[in-house]
Amino acid sequence: MQAQSYVKVINFVRLTLKGNYMASILGIGNALTDILALLPDDSFLKEFHLPKGSMQHVDMETGDKIWKTLKPMGVQLVAGGSAANTITGTAIFGMESAFIGKVGDDDLGHLFKSDQAQYGIRSILLKGVNSSGRAMVFITAPNAERTFAVYLGAALELVPEDLDPEWFKGYDYFHIEGYLVQNQATIRRAVELAKAAGCIISLDM
């Protein structure tokens, strides 16, 4: 997932180099923590009714149960989400980078912020009512087949009224996550604010 984002980022950064000046970018998207779990067999998947090799969205109850069960298993955690991955890439390449999203007041929300902080990203993370969103990836032996369970959680709570015009000022580019299409009112408001701030707008598909 991240490899594809970084290919896009390399091409994007090439376009934003202006002499000795590196452009700045603000992104908005679903703030999700990627959780990678290696499973010896598919018994875990069967327990949570996840067909092997599938990608499913799950509700809060199921998402929280899966995460509680995964915690002791030594899983790998990293801040993810399409736009967040792009912003991480631009930060790594030296662009001043910031990200707008919504998380829960929980361990995964704190991890998301600290993970972005290590790359120097300015995290504008609002607190939601629900628990933090997560993309859980299960890699099952013996053929390393991947199964996905996605819980969007607090990320879905981002609304137009959350957006502050001051956040958009001073950035050259504004990047929107394509997966936010389900939240059209928020996208429209974000585009209005970005245009008012003079940003060039990009959208991943």
Locate each region found by the language model.
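Ribokinase/PfkB-type carbohydrate-kinase core domain
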Residues: N20-K52, V75, K113-G128, R134, ...
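Glycine-rich phosphate/adenosyl-contacting loop at the front of the ribokinase-like
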Residues: K18-A98
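Short glycine/serine/threonine-rich phosphate/pyrophosphate-binding segments
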Residues: G81-T86, L108, G133-R134, Q184-T186
